[in-house]
Amino acid sequence: MNTPTTTSVIIIDDHPLFRKGVSQLIALNDQLHLIGEASSGEEGLELARALEPDLILLDLNMKGMSGIETLRALRDADLAARILILTVSDAADDLVAAIRAGADGYLLKDMEPEELLARIVEAMRGRIVISESL
């Protein structure tokens, strides 16, 4: 069981290497606890319903169910999780679509690892987090 100061996290991303890197990064922060990984939106939705994480890191561009479709489904499932989009897309339209669909943040995958961890902590404090380069 997680203590109140620990944030449970799942990663939904179709790239195994990226999931592995982010999971190793999360392991470096005592406040974060990775409880699951999914390689598709469909799998991620199932996992989120079953595990009810505090935070979901969600890729935008995935095969099958897109990140926006997954985000909408997660919000429709009435999960309390904070959801951060973690993507390579710096397109303004994608950012706007994600925020409108209920994202709590929009972060670019090219950010420094320490910055990503700092933004995750900010998001868990209730802030909307968006990459500075946007």
What role is predicted for each listed range?
Residues 13, 59, 87:
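Active-site residues of response regulator receiver
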Residues 31-39, 47:
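Short hydrophobic/Thr-rich beta-strand motif most characteristic of the beta2 strand and flanking loop
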Residues 40-43, 65-69:
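Acidic catalytic/metal-coordinating carboxylates
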Residues 46, 68-79:
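Short amphipathic alpha-helix used as the core "switch/output" element in two-component signaling
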Residues 62:
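Receiver (REC) domain active-site loop signature in two-component systems and cognate sites
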